[in-house]
């Protein structure tokens, strides 16, 4: 029997698998540490703005996210006309791919890159080219070596998810300088708010001074608005214009728009979250290293924990052990990291429970 057939390549895409979200169990507290969500929730100001917006759900949103683009512009010193907002930065990434990639094109990502990149690439008929990393960090030379006449885009998260590593901005500039002018460099700054290194830059200056670089960001992480699906991009005017031509007319809901605009102005809430993250990221790294586990140095709100390749000590066994205690981390088989788990920096209680749990796990005979 005849039936509709998906476009070529669609069925070759492995569906995205999010971190586990277990249902609470009676009599047991569950800590979800699998999706890099903030343990503090949104800013109280964002919650107030959200509640006010709910009173007007019968109205369509303002179609250009004008209020939010203005708030982002004030916060970062950007021209709002060069900002586009979306239902999470995932929508922005997919819009970029839909606008600039087609059959016969190639886009480059790295070994342990965010899985949305290859999905967006392949969904638009292009080929995903994987550049190897060095020390769980993007390797600029490896990326440049894989550029061909077919290359149209390079995806690069800085810092990277799920490794937590980053590139100094001199390396980002070197990458941009080494790419042909027609290749679009997509800098994903989802975790940039957590970085406090002197050699790190968000990327605004590079975007402002080139015609072939864009910067994406999200309100899902340090701002705690993951459920509202809200993100944004800063880019050259010609790229924003092209994307706006295919963007849905009401792609950002009013509650999301107004909550995000309030969240970005609550710098005290952001700073509190950042300080908590830095403290417990360092503590967890030390505690787990002392247990004999390897922790990749992280600048984000999560850590990458590597387990021995020995029966009784593997990542999958540790995952099952912690899950039985109500501690849910992220397995990373689909990120080519089968013997590692990613852990979100949680509350003090959650962090201590994971350290205690892994101490018990490693002490088993």
Curated annotation (Swiss-Prot):
InterPro entries (alphabetical): Aminotransferase_I/II_large (IPR004839), HisP_aminotrans (IPR005861), HistidinolP_aminotransfase (IPR050106), PyrdxlP-dep_Trfase (IPR015424), PyrdxlP-dep_Trfase_major (IPR015421), PyrdxlP-dep_Trfase_small (IPR015422)
Reactions performed catalytically: L-histidinol phosphate + 2-oxoglutarate = 3-(imidazol-4-yl)-2-oxopropyl phosphate + L-glutamate
Obligatory cofactor(s): pyridoxal 5'-phosphate
Pfam families, sorted: Aminotran_1_2
Superkingdom to which the source organism belongs: Bacteria
Annotated keywords: Amino-acid biosynthesis, Aminotransferase, Histidine biosynthesis, Pyridoxal phosphate, Transferase
PANTHER family: HISTIDINOL-PHOSPHATE AMINOTRANSFERASE, HISTIDINOL-PHOSPHATE AMINOTRANSFERASE 2
Family that this chain belongs to: Belongs to the class-II pyridoxal-phosphate-dependent aminotransferase family. Histidinol-phosphate aminotransferase subfamily.
The protein's name: Histidinol-phosphate aminotransferase
Organism from which the protein derives: Nitrobacter winogradskyi (strain ATCC 25391 / DSM 10237 / CIP 104748 / NCIMB 11846 / Nb-255)
């Amino acid at each position: 029997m005849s039936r509709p057939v998906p476009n070529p390549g669609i069925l070759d895409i492995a569906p995205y698998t999010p971190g586990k979200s277990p249902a609470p169990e009676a009599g047991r507290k569950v800590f979800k540490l699998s999706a890099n969500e903030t343990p503090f929730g949104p800013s109280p100001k964002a919650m107030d703005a959200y509640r006010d917006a709910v009173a007007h759900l019968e109205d369509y949103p303002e179609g250009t996210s004008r209020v939010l683009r203005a708030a982002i512009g004030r916060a970062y010193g950007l021209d709002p006309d060069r900002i586009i907002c979306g239902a999470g930065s995932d929508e922005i990434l997919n819009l970029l791919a839909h606008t600039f990639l087609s059959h016969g094109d190639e886009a480059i990502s790295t070994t342990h890159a965010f899985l949305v990149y290859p999905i967006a690439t392949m969904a638009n008929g292009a080929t995903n080219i994987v550049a190897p990393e060095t020390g769980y960090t993007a390797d600029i030379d490896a990326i440049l070596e894989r550029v061909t006449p077919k290359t149209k885009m390079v995806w690069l998260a800085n810092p990277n998810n799920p490794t937590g590593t980053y590139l100094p901005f001199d390396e980002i500039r070197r990458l941009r300088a080494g790419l042909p002018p027609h290749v679009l460099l997509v800098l994903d700054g989802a975790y940039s708010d957590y970085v406090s290194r002197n050699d790190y830059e968000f990327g605004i200056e590079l975007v402002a001074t080139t015609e072939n670089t864009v910067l994406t960001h999200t309100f899902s992480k340090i701002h705690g608005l993951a459920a509202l699906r809200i993100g944004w991009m800063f880019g050259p005017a010609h790229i924003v214009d092209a994307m706006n031509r295919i963007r849905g007319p009401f792609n950002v809901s009013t509650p999301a728009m107004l909550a995000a605009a309030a969240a970005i102005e609550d710098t005290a809430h952001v700073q509190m979250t950042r300080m908590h993250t830095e403290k417990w990221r360092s503590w967890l790294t030390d505690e787990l290293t002392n247990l004999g586990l390897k922790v990749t140095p992280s600048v984000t709100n999560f850590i990458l924990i590597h387990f021995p390749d020995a029966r009784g000590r593997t990542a999958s066994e540790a995952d099952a052990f912690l899950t039985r205690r109500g501690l849910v981390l992220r397995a990373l088989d689909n990120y080519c990291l089968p013997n590692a788990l990613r852990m979100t920096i949680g509350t003090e209680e959650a962090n201590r429970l994971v350290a205690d749990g892994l101490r018990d796990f490693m002490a088993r005979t």
